[in-house]
Design a protein with these regions (language model features):
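Mature catalytic domains of secreted/periplasmic carbohydrate-active enzymes
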Residues: 12, 48-376, 380, 424-427, ...
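Disordered, acidic Ser/Thr/Pro-rich linker "stalks" and the adjacent N-terminal cap
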Residues: 351-416, 420, 426-435, 450-451, ...
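Extracellular carbohydrate recognition
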Residues: 477-483
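Core-facing hydrophobic residues within beta-strands of well-ordered domains
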Residues: 204, 418-420, 432, 445, ...
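Bacterial Sec-dependent N-terminal signal peptides
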Residues: 1-49
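Solvent-exposed strand-loop boundary residues in beta-sheet-rich modules
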Residues: 429, 441-443, 478, 492
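Asp-box/BNR beta-propeller loop motif
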Residues: 24, 442-447
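Short beta-strand segments and strand-loop junctions that repeat across beta-rich extracellular domains
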Residues: 434-444, 468-471
Length: 493
């Protein structure tokens, strides 16, 4: 009984009632403890079960995803009818009318290239939904076409032995889901739409999310809680991988807010060769843009030889799944030049099955970083790289210790007690090798970690603690120590 009650207190630190129990008579204490045990045990066990089911199973799903090697991205939505990837958000649904749409043609084109899956843009940044949604009138059901495109896609790809993935944009300019003006009803719309997509179309292998915590969308993981959305997806489909297209911001050797690292190669994003290998997705269009343009039928597409030798093969060797975008035209069909290129790719490249086995990975960070812009202190800093650079949410700036300091330290001061259970120390390059992590409990510094860790991304997960300060004391480094981001999280586990 005491062990379980202690665990409950760690899991639910807000139960301050227990602090007063010692003042009561033994029989009353025993009665109250028994009542709490009965009421909270199912919640505790469920939380423990959810936590224990993630780690090794997620690693298995990550490996399976990388082993798929090659798939088809299908950008097909309102931009198809505008000759622009970002159309007018007030564009009329009357424009969307793919009279000859044939999802079976898409699937067979993917098969001809030896692809293993497809991923369709269910909603892009302008907010038009191409499934039968109850969340808005701005959908395919109010267009002249009036048919559920997502259903046709899912049915056709499964019928051809291909796996099904979906793309969804958090940024929604039609419904004004934009930075600095997101209301609770906007978040409910997002949850409703994701629930529809994950309950109406069978097993979804992965969900690619876009327009979230990107420099151009500026919707943060606090504006729309990543942890809430991630947990909703896992509740609806526990084996659905969550991929946020955030590779431009976060370090390549850490899983931040995604189950799979992602890189949009057309935006200049590339995997670093000198960091720890991660399960990865890279994407690029076969044409010059993501959505169909009027010149696509007559402009040459990517050469099959280059697709195979410069993209599929080297990316697969780096534990990276490559997804090639092939945009259907306004009739809902893939153009002949793209079909021919895909068929040639299939002649040049065969899927040889599993890739190199990945090393086991920690679960991704999904909670908000409570250290961002909190008051920071440190030992003597380099004049141009002060302590505030280590928690500014900018991975390209760093706090740097003054070289004269023999025992450098860095500290976050929350000014009040906060609960947390995860700390990440990120360096621009691996340098710090030995250190201590401690927190202030109001009376003394308590130790979280003391030892060696030469990784560039130093991830520490531990039982939840309460403290008003947290610090690192650096005891060993190859050169003058610096920290790009000192991060603190309170994860739900």
């Amino acid at each position: 009984m005491p062990k379980i009650l202690n665990a409950l207190l760690c899991k639910f630190p807000y139960l301050e009632l227990f602090t007063n129990l010692t003042k009561m008579r033994y029989t009353k204490v025993k009665s109250i403890l028994s009542l709490f045990f009965v009421l909270l045990l199912p919640v505790f066990l469920r939380a423990q079960s959810n936590n224990s089911s993630s780690g090794s199973n997620l690693n298995k799903l990550q490996q399976q995803f990388v082993d798929l090697r090659f798939g088809m991205f299908i950008h097909f939505n309102m931009p198809t009818y505008w000759n622009a990837d970002w159309p007018d958000p007030e564009a009329s649904p009357a424009l969307f009318n793919p009279k000859k749409l044939n999802a079976d043609q898409w699937a067979k084109a993917a098969k001809s290239a030896n692809m293993t899956y497809g991923c369709l843009t269910t909603k892009h940044h302008s907010g038009f939904c191409i499934w039968d949604t109850k969340s808005t009138d701005y959908s395919v059901m109010n267009s002249p076409y009036k048919k559920d495109v997502v259903k046709q896609f899912a049915d056709a790809f499964r019928a051809n032995g291909l796996k099904v993935m979906l793309y969804y944009s958090i940024l929604d300019t039609h419904h004004k889901i934009r930075p600095n003006q997101i209301e609770p009803e906007d978040i409910e719309m997002i949850k409703t739409q994701l629930t529809e997509l994950l309950t109406k179309y069978g097993k979804i292998e992965a969900l690619i999310i876009d327009g979230w915590d990107a420099p151009w969308s500026r919707i943060s993981y606090d504006d729309v809680s990543f942890q809430d959305i991630y947990n909703l997806i896992k509740k609806l489909q526990p084996e659905c991988l969550v991929m946020d297209l955030n590779g431009a911001k976060y370090p390549g050797d850490g899983l931040y807010y995604t189950d799979i690292k992602t890189y949009e190669m057309g935006a200049g994003q590339r995997m670093a060769k000198d960091v720890k290998r991660m399960p990865t997705l890279a994407c690029l269009p076969i044409n010059s843009a993501w959505f169909w343009k009027e010149d696509f039928p007559t402009v040459p597409v990517r050469e099959p030889q280059k697709i195979v030798n410069e993209l599929i093969k080297p990316l697969n060797e780096a534990s990276c799944n490559f997804i090639l975008n092939v945009a259907p035209n306004r009739d809902g069909l893939i153009d002949d030049n793209a079909l021919a290129s895909l068929k040639e790719v299939g002649k040049l490249w065969k899927n040889e099955g599993p890739t190199t086995k990945l090393s086991p990975l920690e679960d991704p960070i999904i909670a908000s970083n409570i250290a961002i812009n909190a008051p920071a202190n440190s030992s003597w800093s380099d004049d141009m790289n002060i302590m505030d650079f280590a928690n500014d949410d900018d991975y390209h700036s760093s706090w740097q210790s003054n070289p004269r300091v023999k025992e450098p330290w860095f500290e976050i001061d929350f000014k009040k007690d906060r609960s947390f259970n995860t700390i990440v120390v990120f360096e621009s390059k691996a340098n710090i090798s030995k250190y201590k992590l401690q927190y202030w409990d109001g009376a003394a510094w308590k130790q979280i970690f003391s030892g060696d860790n030469a990784e560039r991304v130093k991830l520490h997960r531990f039982d939840r603690v309460w403290g008003s300060k947290v610090r690192i004391q650096i005891e060993g480094s190859k050169e003058n120590p610096s920290i790009a981001e000192f991060q603190v999280f309170d994860e739900r586990r």
